[in-house]
Amino acid sequence: MRYRHIASALALMLFSATACSSDTVNERAPKTAAEAGQAAYLANCAACHQPDGAGLAGAFPPLKGSDWLTSQSAEALIAAVLTGLSGPMTVSGKDYNGVMPAMSHLSDADIAAILSYVNSGINSGGDAISAEQVAAVRASSGTSADPAQGQAHPGTSQAQAAYEGAPSGVAGVEVKQVRTPGAPDMSEAEFTAASEIFFQRCAGCHGVLRKGATGKPLTPDITQAKGTDYLKALINFGSPAGMPNFGTGGELSAEQVDLMARFLQHTPPNPPEWGMPEMLASWKILVPEAERPTRQMNNYKLENIFSVTLRDSGEIALIDGDSYEIINIIKTGYAVHISRISHSMRYVYTIGRDGKIDLIDLWMPVPERVAEIKIGLEARSVETSKFPGYEDKIAIAGAYWPPQYVMLDGPSLEPLKIVSTRGMTVDTQEYHPEPRVAAIVGSHEHPEFIVNVKETGRILLVDYSDIDALKVTTLDAARFLHDGGWDVTKRYFLTAANQSDKIAVVDSREQKMVGLIDVDKIPHPGRGANFIHPQYGPVWGTSALGNANITLIGTDPDGHPDQAWKVVEVLQGQGGGSLFIKTHPQSRNLWVDTPLNPDAAMAQSIAVFNLDDLDAGFEVLPIAEWANLGEGPKRVVQPEYNRDGSEVWFSVWNGKDQRSAIVVVDDRTRTLKAVIDDPRLITPTGKFNVYNTAKDVY
């Protein structure tokens, strides 16, 4: 699934259809320039403007016979393709709303071929455009060619689309059909099937309640006005409104496209809530506390164990960081998002996208699960108490659906209190019914958890010292809060409000906001990276989904006040599509992944900077090539250090039915040290070293 104005209408017209994706639709390689132009047009433009250039009435302007096209210079057309177009426009006497996304990720040759085909293939007698002309306009406008910045839909980069479009954990639950006046009739079986498709394919962007998140709202007042035929075209071909090309991309059959076009005109079904009765029914103590070991019953160096997510098999692997041997493969919730380690480093808490938490005891002869609970239908975050006197005692988990967080007893996972996050947005002060809980971190300054509420843009300081009389401090940040981490002092929490293109800074000691820092574009730090900059002192860094920027922010208000909470430097990495950036106190390297970059060479490698000579740029290491896995996407994701900072581990993430591996690199020499290639390592993604995770070392 890939998401994709020319300075006037060709841009809008020509490429608002780009939701078709960048994959060629012709299996036979083009033999002529005209065929190449047609193939590129069909792959990138025909979804909206239709294969014959006729457009879609009321939605996407025609290219064939367009008076707008003939009024533009070649340079204007090229600029529109590169930078996009928006706003009202009139084409051949009819009004349209320009929604042409930027297509800068296409090569100069492809853009030239498409424009030439539109000029002389769809139309006749128009001028050919050369790749050299495109290159000149690209250079004069300073437009990047990074494929991760291309937009199949306005505002949605290729990398962001891949990241946000994951299936919702709500799929599979029973929902009640609501018959909606004015909507096409559907049987109960059809409604159930369509609900399942929506939760699997669409809810990640549009929200469970279709109120809009990354994607636009899809409520009946909007969809009924469009009508079934319009919706079928958008679902089938894709559109700038945010829908991928589910039909032409092979994701949905013609019957399913028709089904979804009818379903979207009905009132969205409400998935069931998940309150205390449901949690208690799911809560299981597999090994009571009284029957657990009173001391470590194995010889593993607990500090150097790695908890590795096996995404598609619903498992984690515990791997000995000294011997590289797999200690145990443990069944967990589906697609574990994170592992968090208790302060004592005895317990591992995992949470799956399906809302299931598993508690693993590392003291057992063979580490295994001792308790489990399901805290919602979809979730991403879990954390444990770290403040002195409360170590290992309290846990918290946050859900996407229902939007809530849950306080739990640490050693048993007994649910203690549930708190809803539904409320008003920080900017427009409007009620939001589905504000999802994103990152949660444990404060080192107070007995508090710091909770990011994504859609409202509020950061909650949840005091766990008295759960019966729970006290919550609410800080106004920015919408679409996601992940983040501590500065080196563990006083200041820096977190990305990714769609707002900001980093929010919280002073956990004073329990207040420090400020919001503008960054670009779609920051995604993971926990971020802390190091001493040769010029600016202590900094924290984040990479991005939307471009190649590696943004460094000063974090030392006492020693370097002029640089504190400002962007002090922006490095250029391989490209956009980055999820994680990492260094270690004992390392002089900064590692940046790009697993969601559409360019396979970038997705399969890693960029590494020398912290003592950042101006020298980065070195690229061929991690996937070193793994020697054969076919597959082989995305290289999440650098993770071992306990002492001497090694960096990388997941080489392949398809479920393909070989995957973990590659271990010597941090000092940047050379291959080992490949952990075991058939049980199915789709490895996140890796969490016990010591570094428990002690917030990054």
Map each language-model feature to its residues.
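Electrostatic cytochrome c docking/interface patches
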Residues: 21-41, 55, 59, 130, ...
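Conserved beta-strand positions that form and line the central face of beta-propeller blades
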Residues: 52, 62, 99-102, 209, ...
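Sequence/structural segment immediately N-terminal to covalent heme-attachment motifs in c-type
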Residues: 30-56, 65, 69-83, 150-154, ...
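Bacterial N-terminal signal peptides that target proteins for export
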Residues: 1-7
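Aromatic- and Gly/Pro-enriched helix-to-coil junctions and flexible linker segments
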Residues: 117, 128-129, 137-156, 252-255, ...
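C-terminal motif of bacterial Sec signal peptides marking the signal peptidase cleavage site
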Residues: 16-19
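Predominantly soluble domains enriched in secretory-pathway, periplasmic, or organellar proteins
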Residues: 21, 157, 162-175, 181-189, ...
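Extracytoplasmic electron-transfer domains, predominantly the class I c-type cytochrome c fold
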Residues: 64-128, 164-166, 184, 204, ...
